[in-house]
């Protein structure tokens, strides 16, 4: 689950997550994707670049 907002500046980032994932899977450069999505601040960029889905791994333990 991607956070709704950037932890540092509060900008909404969850709206671009799916497009980012699709374009990254298609082989596009992450820098170009983030630039075109309007994520200029490094705090917002790191939210997408460093995110790892762990929900599926934790689901069996609920």
Curated annotation (Swiss-Prot):
GO annotation, biological process: DNA-templated transcription
GO molecular function, one term: DNA binding
EC number: 2.7.7.6
Catalysed transformations (reactions): RNA(n) + a ribonucleoside 5'-triphosphate = RNA(n+1) + diphosphate
Record flagged with keyword Magnesium: no
Cofactor notes: Binds 1 zinc ion.
Alphabetized InterPro entries for the sequence: RNA_pol_su_RPB10, RNA_pol_suN_Zn-BS, RPABC5/Rpb10
PROSITE patterns attached to this UniProt entry: RNA_POL_N_8KD
Pfam family, one: RNA_pol_N
Entry's localization field: Cytoplasm
Gene Ontology cellular-component annotations: cytoplasm; DNA-directed RNA polymerase complex
Residues engaged in binding Zn(2+): 6, 9, 43-44
Cofactor(s) this protein cannot do without: Zn(2+)
Keyword list, A-Z: Cytoplasm, DNA-directed RNA polymerase, Metal-binding, Nucleotidyltransferase, Transcription, Transferase, Zinc
Function field: DNA-dependent RNA polymerase (RNAP) catalyzes the transcription of DNA into RNA using the four ribonucleoside triphosphates as substrates.
Family label: Belongs to the archaeal Rpo10/eukaryotic RPB10 RNA polymerase subunit family.
Subunit-level organization: Part of the RNA polymerase complex.
Protein name, entry field: DNA-directed RNA polymerase subunit Rpo10
Species of origin: Methanocorpusculum labreanum (strain ATCC 43576 / DSM 4855 / Z)
Lineage: Archaea, Methanobacteriati, Methanobacteriota, Stenosarchaea group, Methanomicrobia
